[in-house]
């Protein structure tokens, strides 16, 4: 089967589209401007990371279908530009979470790290203040200063939302967009939860093999696929990454190859050398190559 390596363009092109709030349509003219600039640099625009999913879709409230309609329009516009894969996530409130954005590695380098003990018993606002003071000028997606005012309100909205509720809301989202994706030739590649366990009492539904099996059962369409992020899934020692690649290989449409060093209750990101972390990067790449 012919495979190509796609690069997520959310990190390549951030001058315009990243300023659009989650839930707004990505206008065709802005998408085409992005396409032309990328192609002028000798690249091909095949994969977009990320078209963010509005919280009302995840909550499944009365506004959900309005925002799904907007998402569908964005899919159509990206399809017209030749995009074949959209990376997205279904994590409530926050995107990926770390407790230190500039941990000293002791060799002149810094890295992202997560320490579960620093989160226990703290509110998101308290954690934000700590991270902001020690972030070396960096920020996490979803943890931007301007969003802090709405965090308490969002947590109230998620009170009582269970894992099963979130799964059902994901199913509804995928059922709505699947026919459009099929028409446009676009695959959806969900990003795993990062870290792959619950934080702040919020439900998490893309953490392990069982979750991925459930995901693929929600919609009977090959548009429903996976972004295989080794750093996210690999933060849990219970995830056998090469085995997961072999199991879900025909639904892996995009991959993030990252290594992490795990310790009890926390982890940090590290170089791609297997010897520098807890992941066997050779076996991971070998499993992907053999698909």
Model-derived regions: residue spans:
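Active-site-proximal, glycine-rich beta->alpha crossover segments in alpha/beta enzymes
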Residues: 77-171
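A short glycine/small-residue-enriched secondary-structure motif
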Residues: 42-58
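Short beta-strand segments at enzyme active-site cores
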Residues: 46-50, 85-89, 186-192
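Active-site loops and adjacent core secondary-structure elements that bind or stabilize anionic groups
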Residues: 12
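Active-site-proximal loop/turn and secondary-structure-junction residues that shape catalytic pockets
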Residues: 18-19, 51-52, 90-94, 192-198, ...
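Glycine-rich, proline-tolerant flexible connector loops at the mouths of alpha/beta enzymes
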Residues: 16-32, 200
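Histidine-acidic metal/acid-base catalytic patches
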Residues: 39, 56-60, 65-69, 76-84, ...
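Single conserved hydrophobic/aromatic residue that forms the stacking wall/gate
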Residues: 2-9
């Amino acid at each position: 089967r012919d495979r190509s390596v796609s690069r997520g363009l959310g990190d390549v092109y951030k001058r315009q589209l990243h300023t659009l709030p989650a839930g707004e349509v990505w206008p065709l003219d802005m998408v085409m401007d992005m396409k032309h600039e990328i192609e002028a640099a000798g690249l091909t625009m095949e994969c977009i990371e990320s078209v963010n999913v509005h919280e009302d879709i995840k909550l499944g409230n009365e506004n959900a279908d309005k925002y799904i309609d907007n998402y569908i329009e964005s899919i159509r516009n990206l399809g017209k530009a030749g995009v074949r894969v959209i990376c997205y996530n279904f994590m409530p409130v926050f995107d990926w979470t770390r407790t230190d954005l500039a941990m000293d590695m002791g060799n002149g380098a810094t890295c992202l790290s997560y320490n579960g003990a620093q989160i226990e018993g703290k509110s998101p606002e308290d954690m934000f203040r700590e991270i902001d003071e020690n972030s070396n000028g960096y920020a996490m997606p979803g943890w931007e200063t301007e969003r802090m005012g709405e965090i308490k309100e969002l947590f109230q909205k998620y009170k009582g939302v269970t894992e099963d509720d979130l799964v059902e809301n994901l199913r509804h989202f995928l059922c709505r967009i699947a026919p459009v994706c099929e028409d446009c030739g676009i695959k959806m590649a969900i990003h795993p939860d990062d870290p792959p366990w619950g934080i702040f009492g919020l439900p998490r539904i893309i953490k392990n093999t069982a979750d991925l099996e459930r995901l693929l059962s929600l919609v009977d369409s090959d548009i429903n696929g996976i972004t295989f992020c080794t750093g996210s899934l690999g933060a849990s020692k219970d995830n056998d990454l090469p085995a997961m690649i072999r199991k879900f290989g025909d639904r892996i449409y995009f991959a993030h190859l990252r290594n992490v060093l795990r310790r009890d209750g926390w982890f940090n990101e590290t170089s791609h050398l297997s010897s520098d972390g807890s992941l066997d990067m050779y076996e991971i790449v070998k499993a992907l190559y053999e698909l």
